[in-house]
């Protein structure tokens, strides 16, 4: 009889803000073989916590890290560490938008506007409702704030969209690039990932993102 391989658990560092795997400015995610070491690291970086993975860093866990924006996974065991390059090929088949998720995480952590500017290369998901009666009309979902201002909703990927859509039926996800995003929300701005990062993209931030797109196309 062949030997049964027992999975070795791992502890993955998670972001308190996005509720997804934590990534640093170099787009690295971190997993540890020791819970204590993982907790110490999470406390050091701040606004992070630890999640135990009973099956270790399997394909599903690596897919989560990639979806959150990680390009590299760092696994640490005592004094030893290993690096794994993460690419969509070989991971769980799903919709990925890692560049935007990485820019969101890094902007929230650093407040450096360069990460907002980077978004001109990214895709966004917006909820849309189309009616053909009595004539065709297109409606985009919004969030109304206590001060009566409203912001359009947008999402980094289908996972974040699904969190919101579970309680909001009748909408369909539409993928747009930044020029489409700008046309929709240039007068009001966007609330990005309302069930996750809750990042407000103001009209000024939208203009900065759009400026990057125009300059790249020139």
Task: Map each language-model feature to its residues.
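An interfacial alpha-helical scaffold signature
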Residues: 1-218
């Amino acid at each position: 009889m062949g030997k049964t391989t027992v999975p070795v658990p791992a502890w993955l560092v998670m972001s308190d803000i996005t509720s997804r795997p934590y990534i640093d400015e170099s787009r690295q995610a971190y997993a540890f073989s020791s819970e204590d070491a993982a907790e110490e690291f999470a406390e050091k970086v701040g606004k992070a916590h630890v999640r135990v993975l009973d099956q270790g860093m399997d394909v599903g866990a690596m897919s989560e890290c990639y979806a959150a924006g990680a390009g590299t996974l760092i696994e640490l065991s005592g004094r030893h560490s290993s690096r794994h390059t993460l690419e969509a090929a070989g991971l769980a088949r799903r919709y990925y938008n890692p560049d935007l998720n990485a820019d969101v995480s890094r902007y929230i952590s650093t407040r450096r506007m360069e990460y907002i500017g980077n978004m001109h290369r990214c895709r966004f998901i917006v909820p849309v409702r189309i009616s053909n009666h009595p004539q065709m009309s297109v409606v985009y979902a919004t969030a109304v704030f206590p001060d009566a201002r409203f912001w359009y909703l947008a999402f980094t990927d289908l996972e974040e969209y699904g969190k919101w859509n579970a309680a909001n039926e009748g909408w369909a996800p539409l993928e747009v690039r930044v020029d489409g995003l700008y046309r929709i929300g240039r007068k009001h701005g966007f609330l990005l990932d309302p069930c996750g990062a809750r990042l407000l993209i103001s009209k000024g931030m939208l203009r900065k993102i759009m400026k990057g797109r125009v300059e790249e196309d020139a």
